[in-house]
């Protein structure tokens, strides 16, 4: 617990699938529409994912992964050094018998993708490692009943995998980064690991019609256009990541990038919200105004200046300017670091802004 906010660990997977239809973009991302009755981000379009459950870390998974994959890394490669946590943010001591975070968070993302979208990111237990984009498992008989059981009790996901003689395809999920919910957006705040999975083909999606009421497969540019035209709503982290993915022209390029990245580079960001006299700016690590201080876990920065004044003064930037609920701008002047990429600057034409 930090101040008044209760932090929960979570994982989300950006599911990128090859697109065979005639289109300049070579892949689409799965976006799920959250139900309006959800307390966190109601109605938003989000990547599949959810809160880490104790069942995701259970040592009972060890028997399922054996004998091909064994502790402590289960074939994920060397353990990467961890980014120091944001000052003042702690999740307490880990259970020494639990699975490593890298494994548990991947299982969490895969389980939640099944619960929310009906997509099974599983691999037969005896299948060798793949050097190309993965493929979702074809829906088995009795899927609806299993899905209901897993939603009621996450421990049933292990039972489902054993029933299918499969393991969660943790090796198809690549570290991408992570986001901490900024102060003020909600009393429910999340420490969310972002993972990326490339699939050769688009799998069948069946929203659960409880947490999720719809879905779309959209390219990064299509998602941006749908957001600007108010067809979908994206939270700032999802918008930033969509714009980051705009750097990749094809699924193969994205897959190569994820596969070749060093393991030690995944970073987790806490946006600090700078409230101006006429709007707000989400400051991200590397920005000249960003302050990594525990005080900002529970408060925002503020200024009497207008947003444009702040922008004119800035030189070293990594920020999202919130013009309105459906107009965000991204400004980055930092060079790419740690073998990751930044989004290109994204500025909305003023004449278009006036119409939105």
Curated annotation (Swiss-Prot):
One of its GO terms (biological process) is propionyl-CoA metabolic process. GO terms for molecular function: coenzyme A diphosphatase activity; magnesium ion binding. The modification N6-succinyllysine is found at residue 299. The keyword Magnesium applies. Residues 72-94 are annotated as: Disordered. Mg(2+) binds at residues 112, 116. Residues 10-241 form the Nudix hydrolase domain. Residues 78-87 have a biased composition (Pro residues). A motif (Microbody targeting signal) lies at residues 354-356. It is found in: Peroxisome. InterPro entries: NUDIX_hydrolase-like_dom_sf (IPR015797), NUDIX_hydrolase_dom (IPR000086), NUDT19 (IPR039121). Coiled coil: none annotated. Keywords: Hydrolase, Magnesium, Manganese, Metal-binding, Peroxisome. The record marks 34, 40-41, 188 as: Important for coenzyme A binding. The keyword Oxidoreductase does not apply. Its cofactor is Mg(2+); Mn(2+). Its EC number is 3.6.1.-, 3.6.1.77. It is an enzyme of class 3 (hydrolase). It catalyses: an acyl-CoA + H2O = an acyl-4'-phosphopantetheine + adenosine 3',5'-bisphosphate + 2 H(+); CoA + H2O = (R)-4'-phosphopantetheine + adenosine 3',5'-bisphosphate + 2 H(+); hexanoyl-CoA + H2O = hexanoyl-4'-phosphopantetheine + adenosine 3',5'-bisphosphate + 2 H(+); octanoyl-CoA + H2O = S-octanoyl-4'-phosphopantetheine + adenosine 3',5'-bisphosphate + 2 H(+). A motif (Nudix box) lies at residues 97-118. Monomer. Belongs to the Nudix hydrolase family. Fatty acyl-coenzyme A (CoA) diphosphatase that hydrolyzes fatty acyl-CoA to yield acyl-4'-phosphopantetheine and adenosine 3',5'-bisphosphate. Mediates the hydrolysis of a wide range of CoA esters, including choloyl-CoA and branched-chain fatty-acyl-CoA esters and at low substrate concentrations medium and long-chain fatty-acyl-CoA esters are the primary substrates. Highest activity seen with medium-chain acyl-CoA esters and higher rates of activity seen with the unsaturated acyl-CoA esters compared with the saturated esters. Exhibits decapping activity towards dpCoA-capped RNAs in vitro. This is Acyl-coenzyme A diphosphatase NUDT19. It comes from Mus saxicola (Brown spiny mouse). The lineage of its organism: Eukaryota, Metazoa, Chordata, Craniata, Vertebrata.
């Amino acid at each position: 617990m930090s101040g008044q906010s209760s932090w929960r660990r979570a994982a989300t997977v950006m599911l990128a699938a090859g697109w065979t239809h005639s289109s300049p973009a070579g892949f689409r991302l799965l976006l799920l529409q959250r139900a309006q009755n959800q307390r966190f981000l109601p109605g938003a379009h989000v990547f599949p994912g959810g809160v880490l459950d104790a069942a995701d870390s259970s040592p009972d998974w060890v028997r399922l992964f054996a004998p091909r994959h064994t502790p402590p890394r289960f074939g994920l490669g060397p353990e990467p050094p961890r980014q120091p946590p944001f000052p003042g943010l702690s999740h307490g001591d880990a259970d020494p018998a639990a699975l490593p975070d890298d494994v548990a968070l991947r299982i969490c993302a895969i389980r939640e993708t099944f619960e929310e979208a009906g997509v099974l990111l599983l691999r037969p237990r005896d299948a060798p490692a793949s050097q190309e984009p993965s493929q979702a498992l074809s829906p088995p008989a009795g899927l609806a009943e299993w899905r209901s059981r897993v939603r009621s009790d996450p421990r049933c996901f292990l039972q489902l995998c054993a029933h299918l003689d499969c393991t969660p395809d943790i090796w198809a999920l690549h570290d991408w980064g992570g986001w901490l919910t900024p102060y003020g957006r909600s009393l429910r705040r999340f420490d969310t690991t972002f993972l990326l999975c490339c699939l050769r083909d688009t799998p069948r999606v069946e929203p659960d019609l409880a947490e999720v009421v719809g879905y779309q497969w959209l390219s990064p540019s299509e998602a941006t256009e749908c957001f600007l035209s108010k067809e979908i709503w994206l939270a700032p982290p999802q918008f930033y990541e969509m714009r980051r993915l705009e750097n990749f022209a094809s699924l193969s390029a994205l897959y190569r990038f994820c596969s070749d990245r060093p393991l030690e580079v995944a970073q987790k960001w806490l946006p600090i919200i700078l409230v101006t006299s006429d709007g707000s700016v989400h400051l991200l690590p590397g920005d000249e105004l960003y302050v990594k201080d525990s005080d900002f876990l529970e408060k925002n920065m503020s200024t009497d200046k207008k947003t444009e004044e702040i922008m004119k003064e800035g030189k070293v930037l990594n920020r999202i300017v919130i013009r309105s609920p459906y107009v965000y701008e991204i400004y980055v002047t930092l060079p790419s670091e740690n073998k990751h990429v930044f989004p290109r600057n994204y500025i909305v034409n003023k004449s278009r802004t006036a119409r939105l």
